[in-house]
Curated annotation (Swiss-Prot):
<dbReference type="GO" id="GO:0008097">
    <property type="term" value="F:5S rRNA binding"/>
</dbReference>
<dbReference type="InterPro" id="IPR005485">
    <property type="entry name" value="Rbsml_uL18_euk"/>
</dbReference>
<keyword id="KW-0687">Ribonucleoprotein</keyword>
<keyword id="KW-0699">rRNA-binding</keyword>
<dbReference type="GO" id="GO:0000027">
    <property type="term" value="P:ribosomal large subunit assembly"/>
</dbReference>
<keyword id="KW-0689">Ribosomal protein</keyword>
<comment type="function">
    <text>This is one of the proteins that bind and probably mediate the attachment of the 5S RNA into the large ribosomal subunit, where it forms part of the central protuberance.</text>
</comment>
<protein>
    <recommendedName>
        <fullName>Large ribosomal subunit protein uL18</fullName>
    </recommendedName>
</protein>
<comment type="similarity">
    <text>Belongs to the universal ribosomal protein uL18 family.</text>
</comment>
<dbReference type="GO" id="GO:0003735">
    <property type="term" value="F:structural constituent of ribosome"/>
</dbReference>
<dbReference type="Pfam" id="PF17144">
    <property type="entry name" value="Ribosomal_L5e"/>
</dbReference>
<comment type="subunit">
    <text>Part of the 50S ribosomal subunit. Contacts the 5S and 23S rRNAs.</text>
</comment>
<keyword id="KW-0694">RNA-binding</keyword>
<dbReference type="GO" id="GO:0022625">
    <property type="term" value="C:cytosolic large ribosomal subunit"/>
</dbReference>
<dbReference type="GO" id="GO:0006412">
    <property type="term" value="P:translation"/>
</dbReference>
């Protein structure tokens, strides 16, 4: 790291917006298992990790692309329902390996109302993990994607071209976005029956 008389350059991963070293230090000191949620522009990534001096040990993980490949999910891989399903899937795998409690590691995401990170955590809680998240309000209709279905219905009646443009991925995979809540239930049942 470069040092100057008035300025000290931060660590590379902090400059890149990848690691909050203060929070990481707190997690390492606590020695608790972390429930890590990362949202990218295309996917949701969930990992359950144990702290180890040599490096973190991944107990279980799930990637939202698995929903498409293994469970035939036809929606987007980075929306609210897929965040919930990815969290649920990762938690099922962790529970199988004997994990019962975790702490939420949301990284540099801002803990704001409606953030997809909390829907992934809610999925893990519903799968059987104990994760303290405080008094964050989570709307059950958003978990199923009812807000997406309502918007799609409204847009279809008002502007068909924009509807086809915004929901091209859904339509290309053979799903009408208005049917997303029922498709969500179907995929959730597949995940439950497979056991992760």
């Amino acid at each position: 790291m470069a040092n100057g008389p008035n300025y000290k350059i931060k660590h590379r991963r902090r400059r890149e917006g990848k690691t909050n070293y203060y929070k990481r230090y707190v997690y390492v000191i606590s020695k608790q298992i972390r429930f890590i949620v990362r949202i990218t522009n295309k996917y949701v990534i969930v990992q359950i990790a144990k702290i180890d001096p040599k490096g973190d040990i991944m107990v279980a993980s799930a990637h939202s692309s698995e929903l498409t490949k293994k469970f035939e999910w036809k929606g987007d891989e980075n929306n609210t329902p897929s965040a919930y399903l990815t969290g649920y899937l990762a938690a099922l795998r962790a529970v199988k390996k004997g994990v019962t409690e975790c702490v939420a590691d949301i990284g540099l995401h801002v803990p704001s109302k409606g953030n997809k990170v909390f829907y992934a955590i809610k999925g893990a809680i519903d799968a059987g993990l104990k994760i303290p998240i405080g008094d964050i309000s989570i709307e059950n209709d958003r978990i199923k994607g009812e807000h997406i279905a309502k918007y799609a219905e409204k847009l279809k009646s008002e502007n068909l071209d924009l509807y086809n443009k915004l929901f091209s991925r859904y339509l290309g995979r053979g799903l009408n976005p208005e049917n997303l809540p029922s498709h969500f239930e179907e995929i959730l049942n597949k995940i439950k029956s497979s056991g992760g």
